[in-house]
């Protein structure tokens, strides 16, 4: 899990340094999704260990992860993170996770 976490966190750092309009952002998002979607349980454990700032940046890919996982477990993870960090505005991500389970 350490390599995995380090990879994702280093991508988050890269993402933080980019200008909001930088086209490279999409590539970073795709890489993060590719790593996290491999194993839902690992992804959930990883997200639960993240701090608020990293989660803020990772929340940009929550919709993509929701459509990959389409699961109650991932939705529950988002709900717990929202409770833990009420300042993170995750309502849309949670809505999307619910919708993706219904599709």
Predicted regions and their residues:
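Amphipathic alpha-helical scaffolding segments comprising HEAT/armadillo-like alpha-solenoid repeats
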Residues: 1-11, 37-49, 71-82
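Short terminal alpha-helical segments
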Residues: 1-33
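Residues in soluble alpha-helical coiled-coils and helical-bundle/repeat scaffolds
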Residues: 20, 34-37, 52, 70
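Solenoid-like repeat scaffolds
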Residues: 15-18, 48-54, 68, 83-88
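Structural detector for internal amphipathic alpha-helices that build alpha-solenoid repeat scaffolds
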Residues: 26-36, 59-69, 91-103
């Amino acid at each position: 899990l350490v390599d995995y976490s380090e990879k994702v966190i280093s991508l988050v750092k890269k993402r933080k340094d980019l200008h909001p309009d930088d086209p490279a952002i999409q590539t970073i998002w795709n890489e993060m999704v590719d790593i996290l979607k491999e194993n839902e349980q690992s992804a959930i454990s990883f997200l639960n260990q993240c701090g608020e700032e990293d989660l803020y940046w990772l929340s940009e890919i929550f919709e993509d992860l929701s459509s990959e996982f389409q699961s109650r477990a991932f939705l529950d993870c988002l709900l717990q993170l929202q409770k833990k960090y009420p300042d993170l505005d995750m309502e849309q991500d949670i809505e999307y996770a619910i919708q993706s389970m219904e599709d």
